[in-house]
């Protein structure tokens, strides 16, 4: 399964639109479902950022993408202020932040046929934070709904394909 959705359109986002199928051509993806007011999301963001800085992703082609989960409740400004402003005391995210709407469609991987499910429903209506590993065929292969960041679980996700 795949989807396309807007990003925060920063340099870190790699453009104004994120295409999961295109990104998966580079390797599997660790998706972190986030909310601006979600303390656990802030915690996971900080742990993933530290893991990247410490080289935990150096021996893998896995990329990281944060997906905003609460489009119906939080504004893009809330998401931007929380995850995109490097100079303040936010939870700056140095990887792609995707901002789908409640009606963003999903597509069958490889055929681009509409699945009939919007993105939130297609990925199981994840709460926040939820971590999901998506393999290079677009399949959800691993998931954790642990609220507070956990190094063991992050390590499990990063090494899933080892």
Where are these regions (language model features)?
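Loop/turn elements at helix/coil->beta-strand transitions in domains of secreted/extracellular proteins
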Residues: 25-31, 58-64, 90-95, 127-129, ...
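Short active-site neighborhood of thiol/selenol oxidoreductases, capturing the structured segment around
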Residues: 18-48, 63-67
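Structural microenvironment flanking redox-active thiols in thiol-disulfide oxidoreductases
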Residues: 42-94, 98, 102-108, 115-116
């Amino acid at each position: 399964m795949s989807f396309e959705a807007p990003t925060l359109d920063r340099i870190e986002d790699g453009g104004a639109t994120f295409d999961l199928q295109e990104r998966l051509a580079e390797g599997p993806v660790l998706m972190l479902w986030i909310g601006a007011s979600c303390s656990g999301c802030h915690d996971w963001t900080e742990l993933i950022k530290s893991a990247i800085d410490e080289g935990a992703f150096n021996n893998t082609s896995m990329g990281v993408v944060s997906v905003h989960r609460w489009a119906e409740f939080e504004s893009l400004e809330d998401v931007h202020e929380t995850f995109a402003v490097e100079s303040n005391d936010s939870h700056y995210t140095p990887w792609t932040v995707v901002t789908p709407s409640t009606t963003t469609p999903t597509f069958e991987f490889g055929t681009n046929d509409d699945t009939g499910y919007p993105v939130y429903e297609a990925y199981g209506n994840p709460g926040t934070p939820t971590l999901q590993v998506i393999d290079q065929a677009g399949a959800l292969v691993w998931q954790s709904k642990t609220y507070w960041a956990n190094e063991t679980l992050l390590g499990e996700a990063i090494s899933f394909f080892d």
